[in-house]
């Protein structure tokens, strides 16, 4: 039985509720190569990808996000790691969703700035917790990125966004250890109604990545957990999607 979550609209795709589970992939062309990103995005769309994630290391790289968005008819997610100004720039060009780890982009004022930019354009935020980059105080408490640690990190960031009256949220808690990842999603799904983005991080080689991602993502979906999933284990995102 699928665990129904609240609906979140990502461009022209709605996840959560009884909506179909949306399949994502991620471009792997250097962000400076705008033409290469656009060409790869078109191939992914033709292969049936429903949501496309593009990395954006800096504010200047938002021009790649804009070019890709203008070239395809599927939602574009900006993957932000450390520079909150990159998130602001992506919101300005009308990206469909922003992925951040709030703990990596600075103090609360920077998080608030991103939230306000997303509120103005109704852009959802995915809180992307990664077992390899948990907060120091959480690692000190648990000693390792165990499921309880990842869930605590996710809920901490959810509360931070909610503090700024923002609830247009999707959550992911990825780990390269598949059993840990699966247990973390079970625990998280039991305590939140935000839609869940399911994936395995640092999955390894193509063959190993397919195996680990198939076990982790497939296992969660069989348990009724997950509203969108992402696979990016291959040199070709199209190959990953078709797998």
Regions from the PLM with identified roles:
Residues 1-25:
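N-terminal amphipathic alpha-helix/helix-capping segment at the start of soluble metabolic enzymes
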Residues 21-35, 77-80, 140-149, 205-209:
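Active-site mouth loops of central-metabolism enzymes
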Residues 21-27, 52-54, 76-78, 98-100, ...:
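Hydrophobic faces of well-ordered beta-strands that scaffold small-molecule active sites
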Residues 47-67, 102-105, 172:
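Glycine-rich, proline-tolerant flexible connector loops at the mouths of alpha/beta enzymes
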Residues 61-78, 114-122, 188-193:
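Alpha-helix-loop-beta-strand connector modules within alpha/beta enzyme cores
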Residues 106-164:
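Conserved anion-binding
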Residues 139-234:
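Catalytic alpha/beta core domains of metabolic enzymes, predominantly
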Residues 232-243:
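Single conserved hydrophobic/aromatic residue that forms the stacking wall/gate
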